[in-house]
Amino acid sequence: MKLPGTLIIARHHESEWNKQGVWTGSRDTHLTPYGFLKSREMGGLLKGIPIDNAFASMQVRSIETLSSMLEELDLHHVPAEYVHMLDERDYGDYTGKNKWEMEKILGEEEFEHVRRDWDCPIPNGETLKMVYERVVPFYQDTVVPLLVAEHTVLIVSHGNALRALMSYIESISKEDVRNLEMLFGAVVLYQVDEEGKTLHKEVRKIDSEVNA
């Protein structure tokens, strides 16, 4: 029996607000020059891999990262779709605030709950659970059928959206998801089963220094 194709996931690289240490969430902000440079390097990690389909969020930092990766690979023909289900977690009232100043206001323990935990509420924002509830159905309904058809699929999204997706793919518990991280400058390659769950995982990384 043939196995499904390869799933590749990557986090957008440094945005203007990442550089400032600001919670970006649902806001749009462009990549920095460093972010563009490193996005191309991330593309270089995938040389020799034929990509059939690509997806990004509807946020410009994700779109710019995907575009830079495909440009580095000279894969301008690859169909790319931008979908809101892959958008970053909405940080609500914390959007636009310096995260390290917020750590002082909230205290270290509460700050880590907000950043890392499964169902920690944010005023007028999303929990990771809410992000999961939009990301995973999109993956199951749209991406998994492509993988089952033996396509190689690239997804470029955001830290929390990818954490939610990885928790499904890798069957990570709600308690352990706080330890899950999708690093800047990393691409993760999965071989998956017909439900989109991991059979094999490979991580490739470039050197990156991002204030996030």
Model-based region annotation:
Residues K2, R40-F111, I169-L183, V187-L189:
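Phosphate-coordination/substrate-recognition cap region in phosphate-metabolizing enzymes
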Residues G5-L75, I105, N124-V135:
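Active-site-proximal alpha-helix that buttresses catalytic centers in soluble enzyme cores
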Residues T6-A10, F55, E81, H151-S157, ...:
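Beta-strand elements within well-structured catalytic alpha/beta cores of enzymes
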Residues K19-V22, Y91-G96, Y168, K201-V203:
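Short aromatic-enriched loop/helix-cap "lid" or pocket-rim segments at secondary-structure transitions
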Residues S57-Q59, M85, R116, H151-T152, ...:
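Short, well-ordered beta-to-alpha junction loops that form the rim of enzyme active sites
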Residues I63, P137-T198:
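Active-site-adjacent alpha-helix immediately C-terminal to a catalytic or transition-state-stabilizing loop
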Residues N98-E110, G196-N211:
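A polyampholytic, Gly/Pro-enriched intrinsically disordered region
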Residues E110-M130:
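Short glycine/proline- and acidic residue-enriched helix-loop micro-motifs
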